[in-house]
Structures are given as structure tokens and as C-alpha cells.
């Protein structure tokens, strides 16, 4: 076995059971990984120097194929209603079979860190079959200084072998695709999928398990900080605008997806960004667009023309096209990945029903209610001929990555909001003037203007009305924003149709929250939406 690159000489792959490998390349950097990926036909070079790979059958995560080992340590700690269990015996069989499958292979290893706060960091070794996967995860996690590699000690190891096919009969899984996590022993096994996002979300899942025990709140959010040290957190599901809205030229970006919040403030889990690229434009998102023109960026499932120019309008492979780049590619990104205690929390939703206002102020109890609800609405794929929006409730704005019961995260959030006097806002980046198919997407300029007023504190002094359906406070007027758009009912041609749609959405919220009723106190239950008379 030939071993190349910088590493801790006392910890090779044989320490986790690998044997008879061909070549192992440790901690290769971008240029080296480009050479490897291109030489093996894994990816294409774009006209501007980015690397573009296709993931084949899997163009997104496979949440139904994700498992957690159920053992003596995890049996009472995991929210099993939301996490599928795998036995220690089946996991060990899977591990042995993956190690056997790897014999004769050349593999890539990256020694990285999850968590910019040294006290809460998770040193992570990622072993991949593909060079482009190695570059992807190198972009996404925190890269230690080169001299630190010689003493690197991983607490988590991820083995990612897309060519390995799991066996439901032999491994106790659902399909040939598997993402299995042994939280007790710090090992994640990924097989049967080339979608690179599985690696980053596996690190997130492990941190989401470990950190609450240390009274640190793990969050599926983006974060930025203003010149006055005013940190803002942006919660939101995929497609709601976390990455876009936190990339603000007037504020320092902490990170776009995963953070922790503890006694010292906020810290990024990552050292890079994983931005959606579908319909990406230089006009709307100049900073993210610029990263696609750079050497080192990895693009996933973006269609290239014959000149190797990316066509961001083309969703023929998937709507979930992505680009992964180091955080320092964003001009005003934080160099430390840390920020003071947050002053503002923004909960983003893309309401395709056209019911929610573009912004609303939340009480701490309403904030916990909406955090546990985790609402957005997806628009069905046009290929199915379905135009009705579909409500999606993903608790904590990231249910697939939350191993513990949502109430653990919700109570921690409520405590941190109260302790730090944080102002909370719900922001709708979805539809206005009607539901999807009738109305139009909320203009990003409107959203940015409202966010600016919320973040600089000027929105706190606005006049508010109480929303008739949800009970939260909605500003009546905001400088630079047309007042009509602040009241969603007035943007609909038919007010009665709006009322009916709003009632349906309220009922969806109430039905979804039933499972949390027994886990929250009365003040949070009272924050539920319901028919109210608007206080004009």
C-alpha cells in the first residue's frame, strides 16, 4: 500500500480495518484533487476553472436510507419516531463488507474539523472513493493548519464508498443505498450514493447529538454579524433563502447552514458553503455567482454547454443543483467562524399558499412554536403535472438531522432567547398575491429591505397589527416597502379565497403540532395559530 500526503503517522487507515489498498492520498489540496478527478473521469473542468461532477441516480439526500445504531448508549437518547434504527450486529456486518469491498482501491483521506469553537470541535476523518468527494468535503469543513495534521486525532470517521451496494437482507436496511451512523463509536458508513451532501449532513447529525449534552444549541441556520457586533441567525429549510439572505455585503458572514449557540455566542460548524445553483444569477446573488467562476469550487449536477459554460437555468438533471466552495471565497466572510451572542433570529419560510405576511414579529413562545413546527411549502415537480403546493413541516427546521427529541432543542432555544433578550421574526420568502400558480414570488428586494429594517432595529418602532389567523405582530408600514404587500389578504384579488386558504393553513399547523403538545408548556401551546379578530 502506497501512502501519499501529510498525516499523523501513527493513525493510518489500517487502524480502522482497511487492508490491501492500492494508494491512499492524505489531505491532498485542490490542484492535486482536480488532477485526480479529471484523470479518472469523475468530473469536468468548467470554462472558469470550477470542477463539475454528476451524481447519477441520487441528486439529493436519501433520508429513508439513513440509520442510527441502536445500542445501550443511544436507546434512550434518540428520537426513534424520526430516526431509523440499525442493530450493532448489522452495522458491523456492513462495516466489514465495506472494508472488503475497498480492497485493491485507491482512496482519498481528509482530516478536517466540524466546529469553529475549539471547546466544541469535532475532529473528523473523511475517507472517500472519489477525488471530487474529497475536494467537496475539504471545501465544506474546517481545514486545520498543515502543521496540525501530524498530531490529528479523529473523533469521527466517515467512510464514503458510492460503488458499494448494501444488501437489505444482509445489512437490515431498505435498499442498496445506506447512510449508517454509529454515534457510540464515532463511525459513519455511506454506500450506494454519489450525492456529496450526505457527508456534510452526517457531521451535522453527530454534532446535533453531542452538543445538547454540553448545553450548546446546534442549529440548521445561516448566520451573519453587523459592524456593531449584532449577530443574526437565519433558520429555514432548503430553498427558503438561508444562503442567499445571509450573504449581505454590509455584514460579515459567519456561515450559511450549520451553527452552534452556547455561552460564548455563535460558531460555525463548517468552513465552506453549499449553495443552491438552480437559476443562480449574477444580478440577484453576485457573491455566490462569483464563486462559480473560481478554481476550487465544486459544482454538482450543473449542466455545462459545449464550451463548458454552466447553464444555471437548466434543471434537466435535477432542480437541486449545487456549488460547494470554501467560506473565504465570499469577500466578507468571517475569518474566525465565531460571533457574539445573537441579537436577532429570523425564521424563514417559503409559503407557497400565499397566506403568511412578508415579515411578522414573534414572541418567545411563538418563536418556539414556529421552531418546533418548521414550516415551509414545496411546489410539486412540474413533470408530475401537479400544481398544488404541499405543506412541509420539518421540526427544528431540520428534522432529518436531529437525532434527539425536538423538545430538547426547542427548550434549549427558548432558554437562550430569554437569557439573551433576542428579537425573533418570521419572514416569508414564498408567494404573495395568491398561491403558487396565481400569485408571484415575494420580490427579493422587498425581503432584503424588511430584513435590513429588522436587523438595524428600526422595525421595532413600527406600528403593528395582530394577524387575524396567526396572532403574531405584522408591521403596518415600513419605509421603502409598499404597505399593501405587508398585508397578504389585500394582495389577493378575492379576500374570501384568502380567508379559506388561511384557515386551511392554520388547520395544517394545528394538526402537525399535536405530537408536540405534551412536550411544551401552556404558554407555547397558547401561541398556536387560530381564528382571531385582527386588532386594527
UniProtKB/Swiss-Prot annotation:
Residues annotated for substrate binding in this entry:
61, 195, 201, 322
Q: Which CDD domains match?
A: PEPCK_ATP
Record EC number: 4.1.1.49
Give one Pfam hit by family name.
Answer: PEPCK_ATP
Q: What class of enzyme is it?
A: lyase
What does the cofactor field's note say?
Binds 1 Mn(2+) ion per subunit.
What catalytic activity does the UniProt entry give for this protein?
oxaloacetate + ATP = phosphoenolpyruvate + ADP + CO2
Its biological purpose is as follows: Involved in the gluconeogenesis. Catalyzes the conversion of oxaloacetate (OAA) to phosphoenolpyruvate (PEP) through direct phosphoryl transfer between the nucleoside triphosphate and OAA.
Task: Indicate what this protein is called per its UniProt record.
Answer: Phosphoenolpyruvate carboxykinase (ATP)
Species this protein is from: Sinorhizobium medicae (strain WSM419) (Ensifer medicae)
| Gene this chain is encoded by | pckA
Amino acid at each position: 500500500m502506497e501512502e501519499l500526503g501529510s498525516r499523523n503517522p501513527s493513525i493510518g487507515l489500517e487502524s480502522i480495518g482497511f487492508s490491501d489498498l492500492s494508494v491512499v492520498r492524505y489531505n491532498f489540496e485542490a490542484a492535486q484533487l482536480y488532477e485526480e478527478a479529471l484523470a479518472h473521469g469523475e468530473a469536468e473542468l468548467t470554462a472558469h476553472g470550477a470542477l463539475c461532477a454528476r451524481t447519477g441516480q441520487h441528486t439529493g439526500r436519501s433520508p429513508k436510507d439513513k440509520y442510527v445504531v441502536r445500542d445501550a448508549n443511544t436507546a434512550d437518547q434518540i428520537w426513534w419516531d424520526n430516526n431509523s434504527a440499525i442493530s450493532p450486529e448489522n452495522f458491523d456486518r456492513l462495516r466489514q463488507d465495506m472494508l472488503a469491498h475497498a480492497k485493491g482501491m485507491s482512496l482519498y483521506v481528509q482530516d478536517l474539523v466540524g466546529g469553529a469553537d475549539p471547546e466544541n470541535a469535532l475532529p473528523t476523518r473523511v475517507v472517500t472513493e472519489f477525488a471530487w468527494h474529497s475536494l467537496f468535503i475539504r471545501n465544506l469543513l474546517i481545514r486545520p493548519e498543515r502543521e496540525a495534521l501530524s498530531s490529528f486525532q479523529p473523533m469521527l470517521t466517515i467512510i464514503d464508498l458510492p460503488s458499494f451496494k448494501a444488501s437489505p437482507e444482509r445489512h437490515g436496511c431498505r435498499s442498496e443505498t445506506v447512510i449508517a451512523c454509529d454515534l457510540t463509536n464515532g463511525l459513519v458508513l455511506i454506500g450506494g450514493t454519489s450525492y456529496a451532501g450526505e457527508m456534510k449532513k452526517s457531521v451535522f447529525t453527530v454534532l446535533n447529538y453531542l452538543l445538547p449534552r454540553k448545553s450548546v444549541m446546534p442549529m440548521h441556520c445561516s448566520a451573519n454579524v453587523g459592524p456593531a457586533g449584532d449577530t443574526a441567525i437565519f433558520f429555514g429549510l432548503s430553498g427558503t433563502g438561508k444562503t442567499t439572505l445571509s450573504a449581505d455585503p454590509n455584514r460579515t458572514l459567519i456561515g450559511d447552514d450549520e451553527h452552534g449557540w452556547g455561552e460564548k455566542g455563535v460558531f460555525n460548524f463548517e468552513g465552506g458553503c453549499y449553495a443552491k445553483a438552480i437559476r443562480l444569477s449574477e444580478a440577484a446573488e453576485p457573491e455566490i455567482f462569483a464563486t462559480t467562476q473560481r478554481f476550487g469550487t465544486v459544482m454538482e449536477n450543473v449542466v455545462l454547454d459545449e464550451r463548458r459554460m454552466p447553464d444555471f437555468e437548466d434543471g434537466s438533471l435535477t432542480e437541486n443543483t449545487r456549488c460547494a466552495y470554501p467560506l473565504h471565497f465570499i469577500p466578507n466572510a468571517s475569518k474566525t467562524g465565531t460571533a457574539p451572542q445573537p441579537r436577532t433570529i429570523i425564521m424563514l419560510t417559503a409559503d407557497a399558499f400565499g397566506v403568511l405576511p412578508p415579515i411578522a414579529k414573534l414572541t418567545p413562545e411563538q418563536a418556539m412554536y414556529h421552531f418546533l413546527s418548521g414550516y415551509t411549502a414545496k411546489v410539486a415537480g412540474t413533470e408530475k403535472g401537479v400544481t398544488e403546493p404541499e405543506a412541509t413541516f420539518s421540526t427544528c427546521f431540520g428534522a432529518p438531522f436531529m437525532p434527539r427529541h425536538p423538545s430538547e432543542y426547542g427548550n434549549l432555544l427558548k432558554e437562550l432567547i430569554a437569557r439573551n433578550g433576542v428579537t425573533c421574526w418570521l419572514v416569508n420568502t414564498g408567494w404573495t398575491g395568491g398561491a403558487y400558480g396565481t400569485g408571484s414570488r415575494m420580490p427579493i428586494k422587498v425581503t432584503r429591505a424588511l430584513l435590513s429594517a429588522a436587523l438595524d432595529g428600526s422595525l421595532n418602532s413600527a406600528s403593528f397589527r395582530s394577524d387575524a389567523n396567526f396572532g403574531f405582530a405584522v408591521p403596518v408600514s415600513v419605509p421603502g416597502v409598499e404597505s399593501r404587500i405587508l398585508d397578504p389578504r389585500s394582495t389577493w384579488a378575492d379576500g374570501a379565497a384568502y380567508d379559506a386558504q388561511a384557515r386551511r393553513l392554520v388547520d395544517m399547523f394545528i394538526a402537525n403540532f399535536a405530537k408536540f403538545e405534551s412536550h411544551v408548556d401552556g404558554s407555547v401551546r397558547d401561541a398556536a395559530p387560530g381564528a382571531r379578530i385582527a386588532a386594527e
